[in-house]
Amino acid sequence: VTTDLLAATAELVDIPSVSRHESLLADHIAAALAGCDWLHLDRLGDNVVARTSLGRDRRVVVAGHLDTVPPNANEVSRVEGDTLWGVGSCDMKGGLAVMLDLAHSLEEPTSDVTWCFYAREEVNRDEGGLLEIFDQQPDWLAGDAAILCEPTDGVVEAGCQGTTRVVVRMGGVRAHTARPWAGRNAIHRLGPVLDRVTAWGGRSVVLDG
């Protein structure tokens, strides 16, 4: 594995991995990690997981997805100065290159580390590689903290909380617009629900003090 992250990312960009077609990149990742004797390597479909087992008192999961959105005449990597162009170069083969470099260089990290390269993030959640691992091999993802290598312009975003999807059903009674008092407006009844959602301030997440 090269320590030139720009070249390493370009190499990954040139391996096509549109969602549901990540097998070539998964093969490449698995082969790149196979020589790391300090890592236990597992594979589930196109998901590749490599773990240290050093007996540390905590474990950090470092994860990144293999897939990209469909290309738009940008299949082949192109370097201009210190800028790399190509499908997935930002989201998120740059992160994958960093993960590979660290996995090769950190033989004895202060925390045990799980390196998780997973498939199908850019599509419906039900198809996601992370969900596939959680369903079939949840122990592979056990950890005390997780770092996702999504692009953030170099800013650490701590404690991302995901999303909540709620289905609310409000009944109503039809009426003519000239006589609204004869009916019951289901949309208006949603007002207090939206007020409560808007008023919720979220929660403060603290990681490692």
Regions found by a protein language model. Give the residues of each.
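Acidic-enriched catalytic cores of C-N bond-cleaving enzymes acting on peptides and small amides
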Residues: 178-209
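Acidic/His- and Gly-rich active-site-bordering loop/insert found
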Residues: 1-89, 108
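Acidic-glycine-rich active-site phosphate/pyrophosphate-binding loop
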Residues: 67-80, 143, 158-169
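Predominant activation on well-ordered alpha-helical scaffold segments within soluble catalytic domains
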Residues: 10, 30, 97-104, 131-134, ...
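Metal-dependent peptidase/peptidase-like ectodomains
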Residues: 145-146, 155-189
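Acidic/histidine-rich catalytic neighborhood of metal-dependent amide-processing enzymes
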Residues: 97-165
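Short, conserved micro-motifs enriched in small and acidic residues
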Residues: 84-97, 181-187
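Active-site metal-binding loops of divalent metal-dependent hydrolases
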Residues: 66, 151, 177
